[in-house]
Amino acid sequence: MTHIIIDGDACPVVDSIIDLTTETGIFVTIIRSFSHFSNQLYPPHVSTLYVDDGPDAVDYKIVQLSTKDDIVVTQDYGLASLLVDKVLIVMHHNGKIYNSKNIQQLLDKRYMNAQIRKQGGRHKGPPPFTKQDQKVFEQSLLKVIHRIKELD
C-alpha cells in the first residue's frame, strides 16, 4: 500500500499533502526532529514521528522506514539520492520528481556550491516559495496519486 513520508523539518507543502490525500486511502507520515515539535492535530490518516535533533537524524529515520511502495517528499538531494532506487517516487516540494538521471546533476551542483562557499564566495540561493510553486507541487502530486490509483 502506498504511503507518503514527508521530510517534515522544513517542508512547505505538508498541508497540501494532507489535504490531497484525505479520502484516498494513502497514509502520510511526517518525520521531524524534536526541535520542530508541534501540537497541531492532523486527520486520522496522518501520523507524526519525532526523532532526536542530531544531524541527519530525520534522514536516517526516513531511509530506515521507507519501502518500495512509498512516496517521499524531501528537498534534501543527499537523502533523495539514497532513496531514488529504493522507493516508488521521491519528490521535491517544487513538484519535480528525482530519478537516477537527474540526481547526480543535482548532487554535483550542491558540491560546487559548497566549494564556492568554502572559498568565501557566494551563490544564489533558491527563490522564496510562492503560492504558484505550491500549485505546481499540488498538480504534480495529484498526477502521481492518479497514476498510483490506476495501478491499484
UniProtKB/Swiss-Prot annotation:
Domain of life according to the entry: Bacteria
TM segment ranges: none
InterPro entries: UPF0178
Family: Belongs to the UPF0178 family.
Record-given protein name: UPF0178 protein SAOUHSC_00689
Lineage: Bacteria, Bacillati, Bacillota, Bacilli, Bacillales
